[in-house]
Amino acid sequence: MKFSDGYWRVREGFTAAWARQTHDIAKTDNGICAHASANLVNGRGDSLGGPVFTVTLSTPAEGIIKVVEEHFRGAVNPDPHFHLNIDEDANFDIETGDGATVFRAGSLEVAVSNPGEIWSMDFRANGHSLTGTSYKGLGAYTEQSTGIHYMREQLRLALDEKVYGFGERFGHFVKNGQTVEMWNSDAGTSSDAVYKAIPFYWTNKGYGVFVNHSEDVSFEVGSETVGKVQFSTKGHRLEYYVINGPEPKDVLRRYTKLTGRAPYLPAWSYGLWLTTSFLTDYDDATVAGFVDGMQERDIPLSVFHYDCFWLKEYHFCDFEWDGDMFRDPRGTIAEHHRKGLKVCVWINSYLSSISPLFDEAMSKGYLLKLPDGSVYETDFWQPGMGLVDFSKPEAREWYCSKLEKLIDMGVDCFKTDFGESVPTEVVYEDGSDSVKMHNYYTYLYNKTV
C-alpha cells in the first residue's frame, strides 16, 4: 500500500507522522526500549503535542532481533497470533557509545541513535551494515475519510540488493519493483493473487525479515521508494524480526527455528503421483485404467490421488464415497496397496447443506456464524455450504474423527484443498478477529489435518 504522492507529498486523504528524533533509551529485562518523537525537541515546549513512537528491541534466539513499534500502546491486539518458538533466556549485550546504543544478539546487532539525535536503527553483522531505518521510515498514517490507522516501516535496500520470498508466488522470482499483498485467495496460478502468502522475505545481502502479523500486510519492494522495502498494516502496532545469515540456508534455518519446521516426510511421498485432477466423471474402472496404463508404459507410480468426485455430487465434503461410482472403496484401496501404491483423497473444510453432515455440524455449533447468530452459508462451491470453525477445539476433534474413518479404510494422506476464501464478516467461537483469521484459517485447517 502506497502512502506517498511522489517523493515529497503524502498521499491525498491521509495524514502522517514519522519518528524523527530519539528522545530516550532505557534498558529492560530482555532488551531496550526507546522513544522517538515526531517533533524535533530542542526544549520542553517542543514536547507539547505530536506523536511519540515506542520501539522495543529484544531477541528470541541468537542472530535474530525482534522489533516492536507502537503508536497508541493501549490499542487492542486481538487474536490470532502466530505461535513462535521464543528462547526467554537468549543472550544479548547492550553497549552505549558516543553516537548510538548497540543491542547485540550474537552475530546480529542493531545500533539505535542516541537521545537528541535524528532517529535511526542500523542492523549490522560481521562489521557490515545489512539494512536499517531512519527519519520518515517509521510512520503512523490515518485515512481521513474512514479514520483507519496504519503503521508503516521502511528498511533500506542497497543498490544491487535483490529481494526474494513472500510465500507461494507466480510472478517474477526477484521481487524488486513489486507490490506484494499478504492475502490468501482461491487464485489460480497466473496472477499476483496467491494461495499461501507468507510475510517473510530475504535478500542477497545475507539477512531476512519476518513481519509477525497474520492479517493483511502490504509490502512495497522498492516500488514506493526505490531504495526501501516498505511494509504496513492497519492498527497502531508493527512487529517484525530481522534475521541474520549470512548464507540463505542460515537465514532459513533461523527463520524456521523461530516459526517451526515441517516434520520429515515419508520417502514414498517423493515419488510420482497420478491424479484424476478435475475429471468429473470417473469410477473404479477409470482409475484402474489409469493405474494399469502407467504400469504398461513402465512409469513407476508412488501415489494415486482421488480428486473431488470421489464424493457424491452436492455432498462436498462429507467424507463419504459415492457408492454409485465406487462399489468397494476399502477393497480398491487394498488393491492399490498390493500394487505398491499409496492412496490420497481430496478434502476441504466446507460442508454442503444437502449433506446430513451439515446438520450434524450445525447442531453442534461447529460452523462459522454471522453476527446475528445465523450459520454463514454461501453457494460459492456447494449449495448453501457452511465452513468448519477450526477455532473451536471440539470442531477440530470432530473433523479429525471423520478423517480417522478414512485412515482406518486405508487412505494414506489427504489433499487439503480450499480454505483461502474465508469471509471477514463471520464470528469465531474463540472470539478471534475475523480479518486476522482470514489467512490464519488455512493454517488451523492444515494443522488440524
Task: Tell me what each language-model feature is.
Residues 1-263, 267-269, 277, 282-292, ...:
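N-terminal accessory segment at the very beginning of proteins
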Residues 293-300:
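Append "and occasionally in soluble cytosolic enzymes with long acidic Gly/Pro-rich linkers
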Residues 70-72, 143, 300-449:
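Aromatic- and carboxylate-enriched substrate-binding clefts and catalytic-loop regions
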Residues 272:
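Ligand-site clamp/hinge motif
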